[in-house]
Amino acid sequence: MSTFTYTVSPAVFKDHPNYRRGVVVFQDLDNSKPNPELTELLRTSEAALRTRITANPAEFPQIAAWRDAYRLFGAKPSEHRSSIEALSRRVLKPDNLPDINPLVDIGNLLSLRYILPAGVHPIGPQSTQIELRKTAETDRFLPDVGGSVEPIAPGEVVLTAGSRVLTRRWTWRQAGDTRTLSETRCVFFDIDGLPPVSQGDVEAAVADLIELVGLYCGGRCLGHSVLDAQHPTMIVQLS
């Protein structure tokens, strides 16, 4: 049995004291079977988003909050969009999102339903000590498997496993080797809330996530938490 630890650095909360990150850990999943019901739920979330965002998505409060957060650590939000802004703009074209696999589709569905970033990462031997923090000099990011290391700006918010960067610019882009595949069986999800997204919104998204993964991927939820400035760490035992 191994231990999975997830921490949000105090430096993140210093800049964003009301930030919350929902974290949910699953094991023994079956991510191999596409499901028409899940696809229909995704289409419903896309349609609902189009009725909620009828003007410039950059000005929608839940998206504007991320643009402000990106500016704070030196990113240009018009060049490097948060995952929820990029996803929303794609849906508003209007395009339907592709069916990738159930876990990825569930993350996209929740992002659109709550208008917040939600992502999934596989858990492996080298990814059991996770931290959301600001960059360190030794950090390395590989955007593509087998590719070259990409330089990272100082002060950028990144998701890490040791010096390995799993996601750049908070919610912008995952490393090439962190993709969730059809054979993936153990994962963690991130669900992000910056005001005006509330504690209740993040908790509701976490509850939806647990229900959807149980319905469409089976497996077990090993633990879940909403991390905040008072409770920045989560520990789960993996079997």
Where are these regions (language model features)?
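Charge-biased, low-complexity intrinsically disordered regions
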Residues: M1-S239
